[in-house]
């Protein structure tokens, strides 16, 4: 079976041969003159023949991106499949797949093949703003700017290379139902994307991620030690002008003042 995919860095089309040999799936990349280090160093990629795959640590981020670009993500990867990324500050982040073809690409070309969020909360807690305000919602808040700057820069270079900007919908805050479109590389989930409904947030902030629609999937967050923590959502709290939505340690919907410290479980799309 031959699949044609677009290699975005060079604007050319490359071919992938997919075959089965000795009990493994073999992805054979045609890498002549393509200038992609991942392909040049590993032209043949063995994948254990377990489908869909749950542990993706034997694949590089570039290989995962290529499978998504070929339209094969859903049949190749399990919902909830995980991969670790060694960050530049020494933190080992683990990411899980929470959806396929869910997020709108910022360039208008369609849907991002795969959406991810962090399995355990990031090691540092952040506030959403320096002042107790949700004016401007996610689009204006300090945490969004830090996430797409400081936090993104700490991800491995390989992960940064495959993250695609997407459009995230969030209310304008200050008890408004107006929806702002934010272009993000890293983002927090909205209340609707996590719980599937608006509890303390304004309507129109995206759609329920497939992973969180499953029965027995917890909404609460754990830190790197396995302790439950209160996590931030990007949704402005609809009933006041000083808070953002959050998730309490029992997994219930809550809110906290924008100046409070809370756990981050960032997401991205590729």
Which residue ranges define each predicted feature?
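Short, low-complexity N-terminal tether/leader segments at secretion or assembly junctions of large
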Residues: 1-47
């Amino acid at each position: 079976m031959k699949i044609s995919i677009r290699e975005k860095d060079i604007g050319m089309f490359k071919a992938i041969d997919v075959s089965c040999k000795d009990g493994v799936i073999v992805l054979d990349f045609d890498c002549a003159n393509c200038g992609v280090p991942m392909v040049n160093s590993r032209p043949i990629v063995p994948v254990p023949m377990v489908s869909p795959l749950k542990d993706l640590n034997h694949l590089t981020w570039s290989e995962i991106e290529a499978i998504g670009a070929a339209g094969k993500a859903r049949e190749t990867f399990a919902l909830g499949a995980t991969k670790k990324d060694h960050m530049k500050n020494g933190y080992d982040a683990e990411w899980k797949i929470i959806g396929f073809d869910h997020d709108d690409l910022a360039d208008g070309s369609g849907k991002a093949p795969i959406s991810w969020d962090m399995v355990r909360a990031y090691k540092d807690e952040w506030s959403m703003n320096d002042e107790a305000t949700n004016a401007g919602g996610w689009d204006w808040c300090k945490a969004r700017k830090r996430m797409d700057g400081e936090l993104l820069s700490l991800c491995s270079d390989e992960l940064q290379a495959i993250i695609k900007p997407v459009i995230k919908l969030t209310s304008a805050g200050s008890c408004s139902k107006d929806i702002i479109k934010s272009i993000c590389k890293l983002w927090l989930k909205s209340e609707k994307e996590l719980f599937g409904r608006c509890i303390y947030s304004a309507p129109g902030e995206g759609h329920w991620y497939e992973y969180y629609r499953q029965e027995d999937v917890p909404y609460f967050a754990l830190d790197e030690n396995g302790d439950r923590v209160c996590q931030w959502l990007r949704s402005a709290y609809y009933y006041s002008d000083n808070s953002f939505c959050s998730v309490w340690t029992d997994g219930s919907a809550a809110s906290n003042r924008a100046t409070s410290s809370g756990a981050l479980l960032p997401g991205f799309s590729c």
